[in-house]
Structures are given as C-alpha cells and as structure tokens.
Amino acid sequence: MLPLFLAAAEAHVAEPGLVAELVEKFGLDPKYILIQTFSFLIVLGILYRFAIKPTIAAMEERAEKVGAGLKYAEEMQAKLAAAQQESAAIVKKSQVEASRIVDEARRTAKDYLDKQTQEAAAKASETIAKAQQAIELEHRKMLADARTEIARLVVITTERVLAQKLSDSDRAAYNASATRELTNV
C-alpha cells in the first residue's frame, strides 16, 4: 500500500491531474475510505476483545502453567536427588547393620559351638570317669569273687591233703588261719 501512496504523491507533484485520475481509476473515495477505516477499527476492536485478548490471556496462562510446571519439575528433581541420597544413606546404614548382625550371629554361633564343645567334653569326661569307676568296681568285685573262689579251692585242697595227715583240731586251726590270710589278700 505504501508504494501506491508514493506513486500517487510523485504523480501529484509531477502532474496535478494525474492524482485525480488515479483516484478515479482505483475508486478511492474519501468517504468510502473513512467508512472502511471505521469498519476495520470496529472489526479490530471486536477481534481484539473476543479473539486476540482471550488468546493472549490463554497464552499467558499457558506460559504460567509451563513455568509452574518447570519450577515443579525442578523441585521434583531436587526432591528426587534428596530421596536418592537418603535412600543411599539408608542402604549404607542397612548394610552396616546387616554386617553387624551377621558378625554378632557368627560370634554367637562360635560361642554356642564352644559351649557345646565344652559341654560335650565335660560329658565325655564324666562318662569316662563313670566307666572307669564301673570298671574299677567290676575289677574289685571280680577280684573279690576270685579270692573267694581261690580261698574255697585252697580250703578244699587243704582239707583233702590235711584229712589224711592232720588231726581234727590242727585242721580247724589251719583252716581258720588260711581263711584269715586269704581274706586279708
């Protein structure tokens, strides 16, 4: 549109009738131009009020939402980083606690094993001592039985030998003496 006005201005300077001719050729009537300008301003006002202004408001609202979303995303990133650090600290603490529990369990198991070993050794020693006592008792009983049997055999043998050569009173004294001797053994 600007070149048209420039051309009209040049033509008016060069030839005054040429502008009127151009205005007539293009149908430029000041009354119509004023009406068109007024109509354009009305349409522009309606468009601004009902189309452009709500669109700008929606765009600003959307920009605010996007800004709030970005801010929220940054906050969430910070919270995520903090949560990751916290979870890493919790995992590390849990690992330390688990190691401590495992070490304590090992120590308890070792103590229990040592205690059980000591108890088993004590029971074995006690069983061995009881077995030795039983063997000793059995040995004494066997010796006593053997002494009794030997004494009986000696008495019988002595009776047979002495029955032929000794008198009854000598035999009784000899039997009593032999019995005393065997009892002391």
Curated annotation (Swiss-Prot):
One of its GO terms (molecular function) is proton-transporting ATPase activity, rotational mechanism. Pfam families: ATP-synt_B. Keywords: ATP synthesis, Cell inner membrane, Cell membrane, CF(0), Hydrogen ion transport, Ion transport, Membrane, Transmembrane, Transmembrane helix, Transport. It is a single-pass membrane protein. It comes from the Bacteria. F-type ATPases have 2 components, F(1) - the catalytic core - and F(0) - the membrane proton channel. F(1) has five subunits: alpha(3), beta(3), gamma(1), delta(1), epsilon(1). F(0) has three main subunits: a(1), b(2) and c(10-14). The alpha and beta chains form an alternating ring which encloses part of the gamma chain. F(1) is attached to F(0) by a central stalk formed by the gamma and epsilon chains, while a peripheral stalk is formed by the delta and b chains. It comes from Opitutus terrae (strain DSM 11246 / JCM 15787 / PB90-1). This is ATP synthase subunit b. Belongs to the ATPase B chain family.
